[in-house]
């Protein structure tokens, strides 16, 4: 969903449609061979015959995003943003251009180094989570930053620290290219709100993104700290609608760059004993086209659906029952011919009244809402909550606060698995 709308909890925009129910089960597993989408089928990225070899280690992804760690979204971390002197600016570039990196560089480095700690990752593991998705900007690879782009340097040192913490805790990692050269969005998560122009969709900016993907792929296979990385997502939430070259140029070439890089390192997806990365694309439900139309969809590909119920359902469905009805009936997670992860979702609501966290019966509703979200995600390959932590007093965007509030059980084995019975 559009993240400035998401962040302010105001109404958002979406071209995504509501789909009907399905009983299909989609897994990321290491011992299953089925590769087609049928009722009650399991779609695998790995099999026991040795014909494929990937880095996935879990059956169902249960994870959290590390939002606002390497790309600050001001709505999520208002205290940090104020400490930067950036209050009122809506993106990193907007503030950087005015205050300058001479002032801000050390503040970014302090944030990268301290917003998370090793203890966060041990706590994630304790809560039954197995995956972290790390939203990253292209400027982690400094050679791709143009002279006129005022973004802080030096973040890769801290990315390495972060993936190492995940590795130490036994968590697998998805590297998500969240902010792309030239902007794939005008929202704050793209790092640049200084213009309404979206300029990513060009050969020159694609080339910079390919350089990032090559760098990350190399690190995933050569740097021990990055051995926890199991997947790369080449673009997060591109501008909706059919964008020039996204489907027929960028998507297949991104796949080729990753696979060619792996091949040069002696890593293949076919029986070598080496473990290739999964490549994850936004699903067609996002509204920017069907990525499977121009890629090799059998080449260890997965899809990402951002299951923000509050912006997907019609206004008439913005009730407690409407939210649960949608989640229990939707087949969004099984509509692609491949494993689909709900790569972002939250417990945020739109509609007021009975949907407010302070309304009568709120605890019972939000427990059911969380269980239904998890149910919907696990119809597919799993789910990743947005986000593990914020600086908000919000139980709906912050996984830790949601657990403390009783919305999500501290032990995921206690989630209500009967929430969708009868649908």
Where are these regions (language model features)?
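C-terminal membrane-anchoring module of eukaryotic surface/secreted proteins
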Residues: 1-15
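N-terminal carbohydrate-binding accessory modules
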Residues: 21, 26-129
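Substrate-binding cleft of secreted/luminal carbohydrate-active enzymes
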Residues: 62, 334-420
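Hydrophobic faces of well-ordered beta-strands that scaffold small-molecule active sites
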Residues: 62-66, 132-134, 173-177, 230-232, ...
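Aromatic- and acidic-residue-enriched segments that line the glycan-binding/catalytic groove
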Residues: 74-89, 150-153, 182-200
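An active-site-proximal structural segment forming one wall of the substrate-binding cleft
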Residues: 110-132, 147-179, 190-231, 257
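Short acidic/His/Gly/Ser-rich catalytic and metal-binding motifs that mark active-site loops
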Residues: 140-144, 181-191, 349-353
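Extracellular glycoside hydrolase catalytic/binding regions
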Residues: 224, 228-231, 235-374
